[in-house]
A protein has these predicted regions:
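Conserved small/polar residues in nucleotide/adenosyl-binding loops
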Residues: 184-185
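Rossmann-fold cofactor-recognition segment
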Residues: 47-61
Length: 185
């Protein structure tokens, strides 16, 4: 994809995969990048064409206002986790922790719901899932369930938003702060 001159919005864009995407898009010539996080100050060495914004993907009113103020854009990337993930054996897991893991799904649906209206007709949405969506390892049932739901959501909404596109990126284990927190599963 040629991103030269494009306006790109990246939720979860200040750490991990999102931070890497922000910096790569900057290097590849994006005209403007808005990197969004609940804690944008954690990003260091912010490229010149990157603006940092503080928004929680679960705050629908903030999202509505943000997208309205931004106007049209070309690419929407969402890799915001939405919160914490429950880990460990499901039969011993606190069910509230399991339910809370779905904040990622609700954040993704909020961003797609409120952002698609402003996405250019030839625009693209990219959602980050993960390999546990298709191959669940012991202790990863919450991550697997959420990833599966995110992937099903993208497949389901694709025809509704056409000709705009929606794609899933589904990495394996990446050296990120979130992955490091899951090592002890």
């Amino acid at each position: 994809m040629n991103i030269s001159g494009k306006k790109i919005i990246i939720f979860g864009g200040t750490s991990g995969i999102g931070e890497a995407a922000t910096k790569i898009m900057s290097e590849k010539g994006a005209a403007e990048i808005i990197a969004i996080s609940r804690n944008p100050d954690k990003m260091t060495n912010v490229p010149e064409n990157v603006t940092l914004e503080k928004i929680d993907v679960l705050d629908e009113e903030a999202l509505k206002s943000f997208f309205k103020n931004q106007g049209e854009f070309d690419v929407l990337i969402n890799c915001a986790t939405g919160g914490t993930r429950a880990v460990g054996p499901f039969l011993k897991m606190d069910l509230e922790g399991y339910r809370s893991s779905f904040a990622k799904l609700w954040g993704y649906t909020n961003v797609v719901r409120y952002g698609t209206e402003y996405l250019a007709n030839n625009g693209n949405i990219v959602l980050v899932s993960g390999s546990p969506a298709r191959k669940c390892r012991p202790g990863q049932i919450a991550i697997s369930s959420v990833g599966g739901a995110v992937e099903a959501f993208a497949r389901g909404i694709a025809s509704e938003i056409a000709p705009k596109r929606i794609n899933i990126v589904s990495p394996g284990v990446i050296d990120t702060p979130m992955s490091l927190s899951l090592i002890h599963i």
